[in-house]
């Protein structure tokens, strides 16, 4: 379900990502990507285990 604020939220996130893409170093980008992937993977594992129990 798409709410009224979601396109604005996506636009703000996209603008922030583009801004950070030019301002932060490559090592920091890799660290951020690794942290986000780790959080998503842990959430997926907990969600899978919870739904299997």
Curated annotation (Swiss-Prot):
GO annotation terms (biological process): DNA-templated transcription termination
GO molecular function, one term: helicase activity
Keyword Isomerase (UniProt): no
Entry's Gene Ontology cellular component terms: membrane; virion membrane
Subcellular compartments: Virion membrane
Role played: Protein probably involved in counteracting host defense, since it enhances virulence in vivo.
The keyword Iron-sulfur is annotated on this UniProt entry: no
Family, as annotated: Belongs to the orthopoxvirus OPG141 protein family.
Membrane topology listed for this record: Multi-pass membrane protein
Alphabetically ordered keywords of this record: ATP-binding, DNA-binding, Helicase, Hydrolase, Late protein, Membrane, Nucleotide-binding, Phosphoprotein, Transcription, Transcription regulation, Transcription termination, Transmembrane, Transmembrane helix, Virion
Main location: virion
Regions that span the bilayer: 5-25, 30-50
Cysteine disulfide links: none
Reported induction: Expressed in the late phase of the viral replicative cycle.
Xref: InterPro entries: Poxvirus_A14.5
Protein name as catalogued: Virion membrane protein OPG141
Record PTM text: Not phosphorylated.
Residues forming coiled coils: none
